[in-house]
């Protein structure tokens, strides 16, 4: 069984502090015993001194388990099919307090599209955010547990995501997988939103950007939004062959 634990991070003072803390608890409560390789992915901003700073924060007996890998320069390039101006106009509306930047959205895409090539050659991989903390000792090897139970994916939490942030997701999947509508129906919660409220004005503007005038959704006072139930994937373990199907 070939395994690895992956981080994706940036070389800023705040993120380095988070990463050091995460690594401390990773080894204290799990990996000093089970000794899985730890791979820190970055966009080329971790020079020798920065890498050394991180390595010296890890207990000496475990430093050899930690390595750094620079991402391909094109990994975070905006795809050609995306209209940059339209995207920037949508982001500028800030429809919710946690409306995300273009870089954050590219990061989400990276985990789905590009991460598998860095996980190639491993049977199972774990993802941790650089601010993830394993708070208590784990008295069993998570990878062995994962393999024993013949799992494809495991996370520590399910949550209901924002219906505004995920607008159009349910319809997209139903159009792409018409024979899975019943299953998809169980994966989303309906929300009725009052479209006359002044707080919904940014979302109304978003709809006008996303849809041609003759394709605008019809609503009198409210609109149904669909919130997906999804894994909180700041922590997960997965079988790499699942993503190669």
List where the protein language model places each region.
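Short, charged/polar "capping" segments at the starts of alpha-helices
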Residues: 15, 44-52
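Conserved catalytic core of nucleotide-sugar-dependent glycosyltransferases
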Residues: 90-104, 108, 116, 132-245
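Active-site-proximal specificity loops/subdomain of glycosyltransferases
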Residues: 57-121
